[in-house]
Amino acid sequence: MVTPLNIIFAGTPEFAAQHLAALINSEHNIVAVYCPPDKPAGRGKKLTACATKLLAIEHDIIVEQPINFKNEEDQQQLAKYNADIMVVVAYGLLLPEVILNSPRLGCINVHGSILPKWRGAAPIQRSLEAGDKKTGVTIMQMDKGLDTGDMILSAECEIENTDTSASLYEKLANLGPTALVNTLTIMAEPDYQASNHNIAQDDELATYAKKLDKTEAELNWQFSADELHRKIRAYIPWPVAQFTFTESEGKQHRLRIWQASVQEYRGNADPGTIIKADKEGIEVATTSGSLRLEVIQLPGKKALAVKDILNGRSDWFVVGSTINKLG
């Protein structure tokens, strides 16, 4: 029988809330939930609680919302919970060493990649962009480095050719909670010793998943069709891959791409040239192969299948014309 652990949970979005729900339903005790202060949201800029706070309130769990942990009073407040362990999932705040060392078993983190690959802020997006065939979650012991701590447990899943960041996020949100509970089962054993179980990361194999910037969404047709397809999938639901269409009179429109597919093309059209436009989609030449745009979004409109857009805008997508790179 597992000895229940007293846990401080720190996390913010729905992804974190799904992990918190698994802990609430486990044999362990959640002594407090930490999340950032409420933020203005919506048109009315009303202060809105994050997903983890709402779940904690629903289950009568104490909620703490420090701005950061630079304040000694906040550090002491956390220590008063006398937690066995702190679980961190998409929290968004840096933890100083005094916090990392406060719980008896330290702090563990659920990271959205198989470490040491894709350390950093955007592991899901970067794994898609790179064309990885597998990804997963790693439960690691946190240290003062960026995702450099020893690995306790990992779980893998396949990346399908149709996966987007949104669908892969859901896969990991289903994978992570089980991996987390299994990790806590290991750590709750009376004879658990990190030195006998944890595995150090090989820094030479590490890659960095830098935070996404909205400027990356601007498609450059000098990439191959395969590379562009991966970028489109990686940038859903944000920032969404985009290109600019220029009308004959010079007016520009920014269009977003929500679905596309790679096609074989062995012609010599310049990259960015429309080589086909029909109910199947708008096919654009690249440096290698062609990209068929299947679902796009016009400015101020909802995303639609290309066949529906061509009914009213066929003059925009004439075979032989060129789609511009943004900027």
UniProtKB/Swiss-Prot annotation:
- Please tell me which top-level EC class this enzyme sits in: transferase
Q: Name one Pfam family in it.
A: Formyl_trans_N
Enzyme Commission number(s) from the entry: 2.1.2.9
- Classify the source by domain of life: Bacteria
One GO CC annotation, please? cytosol
PROSITE patterns in alphabetical order: GART (PS00373)
Q: Which InterPro entries match?
A: Fmt, Formyl_trans_C, Formyl_trans_C_sf, Formyl_transf_N, Formyl_transf_N_sf, Formyl_transferase-like_C_sf, GART_AS, Met-tRNA-FMT_C
Keyword set includes Transferase = yes
Q: Does the keyword Protein biosynthesis apply?
A: yes
| Catalytic reaction annotation | L-methionyl-tRNA(fMet) + (6R)-10-formyltetrahydrofolate = N-formyl-L-methionyl-tRNA(fMet) + (6S)-5,6,7,8-tetrahydrofolate + H(+)
- Identify this protein by name: Methionyl-tRNA formyltransferase
Q: Which organism is it from?
A: Colwellia psychrerythraea (strain 34H / ATCC BAA-681) (Vibrio psychroerythus)
